[in-house]
Amino acid sequence: LAGLAAFRWNEITRMTEICWKDREEGFRPMTDRDEGTLWSRINKQQKPMRFADLRLVLGSEFVPVYHPFKAYFYGLPRWQEGDADYIKQLAETVTLADASPEARNTFCHCLKKWLVAMVAGFLTDRVNHEILVLIGKQGIYKTTWFHFLLPPELRNYYVAKNNSRRMNKDDRLLMAEAGLICLEEIVTMTDEEVDQIKAAVSLPQVVERAAYARNKEVRPHLASFCGTGNQVKFLTDLTGNRRWLP
C-alpha cells in the first residue's frame, strides 16, 4: 500500500484521504473507485489480498491521523512584536455605517475577540459562543467576505446555511465538521429559530451517529457561527443579545 499511495485519516471529516504517488494531485477523500484500484493493483503486482482485508488495513492505525486546522495553524510563522496588525487590516475592509474612530475601534476589538475565539475553537476544546453579524443592503458581498475569512487550505470547511428553521441531525454534525457556518438572511428567523441557534452555539460537544456509522460519537464542537442580514433590529429576545455581535 505504501508504495502505491500515501494515506491519512481526517479527524474532522472522519474520512480517509489518499494521495496517489503516480498522479500529480494532492490529498483528497478516498472513493470506492480508489479502493477498487488499490485492490486491483495489489493483486496484479504482489500477492492476492481479500478486499475486506484491504478495508480493515485502511481503517487501522496504519493510516496516520490528520487534523487539518492544527496542521495549518501550527505550520504558520509565529507572529512577532512589531509585525503588521493583520486583524486591524482585515477590519478596515468592512465599511461601517458610523465612520467615527470610536466605532472603528469598537468593531476592530469585537472582530479580534471573535477571531481569537474561533481559532481557539479549532485548536482546543473551547467553543466560540458569539456570532458575528454583518448588516447591510443586498449585493455588497457580506457573505463573500465571510467565505474568504478561511484560507484556501481550509475553505472546504465553510458552510453557508440559508434555512435555519430546523436544527436537525445533519446540522448538529456540521458543528463538528465545519469551521465556519454562515447563517444567511437571519432577519427571516423566528424567535424559535433564534433560540435553537443560541442553544446550538453554546453546545460543548456533538453527540450523534453519522451516516453509515455503527455507533454514536462524542465529537468536539468545532464550528464558529456568523450571519448576514439587511435589518439592524433583527433580534426580539428581551432577555439579552449576548451571543450576537452586529
What are these model-predicted stretches?
Residues 60-177:
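P-loop NTPase catalytic core of nucleic-acid-dependent motor ATPases
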Residues 1-85, 89, 96, 101-106:
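N-terminal nucleic-acid engagement/recognition segments and initiation subdomains in replication
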Residues 189-195, 237-238:
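Conserved ATPase-coupling elements of RecA-like P-loop NTPase cores
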Residues 145-148, 192-200, 243:
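Alpha-helical scaffold elements adjacent to nucleotide-binding pockets in ATP/GTP-utilizing enzyme cores
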Residues 171-176, 210-228:
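AAA+/SF3 P-loop NTPase mechanochemical coupling elements
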Residues 184-186:
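Walker B catalytic acidic pair
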